[in-house]
Curated annotation (Swiss-Prot):
Originating organism: Paracoccus denitrificans (strain Pd 1222)
GO molecular function terms attached to this record: disulfide oxidoreductase activity
GO aspect biological process, one term: cytochrome complex assembly
Protein name per UniProt: Thiol:disulfide interchange protein DsbE homolog
InterPro entries: Periplasmic_diS_OxRdtase_DsbE (IPR004799), Redoxin (IPR013740), Thioredoxin-like_sf (IPR036249), Thioredoxin_CS (IPR017937), Thioredoxin_domain (IPR013766), Thioredoxin_ResA/DsbE_sf (IPR050553)
Length: 179
């Protein structure tokens, strides 16, 4: 019979330590914990592509007076579908501009036809180049832009529930109060 040695527990202890650290890292990960390098900078170009029959979003629109939102979305994105009613509500208060990310034209237009179009103007980003320039990691992401075209806040994830109420709305209200 083999004798028990404390060294036999070493591999188990090492594995448990790595598993614990990995779990802790996953649970504490907040997409906004590392702020976007774009905060305080002028919004990058939105490109020149749009969806047929929609108002073209231009770089000049981002520099017009007043607070506005730029939302990166896609019809294939479930969180984008979840936040769509919130965008519709917000569009009654301020301009909401959309950048359709890596979406076939027909799918994007079908989505907007079915669910409503909250966007005052749209850009299309079929290759994802505009999203890269903005530092977007995955849709949906929403940016608060000031009247001079500077990015004030980046919100990664859908604008829903407590996340919307506790993290996004205070930033939006702060931007609106500063105008």
């Amino acid at each position: 019979m083999a004798r028990f040695s404390p060294m036999m527990l070493l591999p188990v202890a090492i594995f448990a330590g790595f598993a614990g650290l990995s779990g802790w890292a996953l649970l504490r990960d907040d997409p906004d914990a590392l702020p976007s390098a774009m905060i305080g900078r002028e919004a990058p170009s939105v490109g020149e592509a749009t969806l047929p029959g929609k108002v073209q979003l231009t770089d000049e629109m981002l520099r017009q007076p007043g607070v506005k939102l730029v939302n990166f979305w896609a019809s294939w994105c479930p969180p984008c579908r979840a936040e769509h009613p919130t965008l519709t509500e917000l569009s009654a208060r301020l301009p909401v501009y959309g950048v359709d990310l890596k979406d076939p034209e027909g799918a994007a237009l079908g989505f907007l036809s079915e669910h409503g179009d909250p966007f005052h103007a749209l850009a299309a980003d079929p290759r994802g180049r505009v999203a890269i320039d903005w530092g977007v990691t995955a849709p949906p992401e929403t940016f608060i832009i000031d009247g001079s075209g500077r990015i004030l806040h980046r919100h990664a994830g859908p604008l829903v529930r407590e996340d919307y109420t506790n993290r996004f709305l205070p930033e939006l209200e702060k931007a609106l109060a500063a105008e």
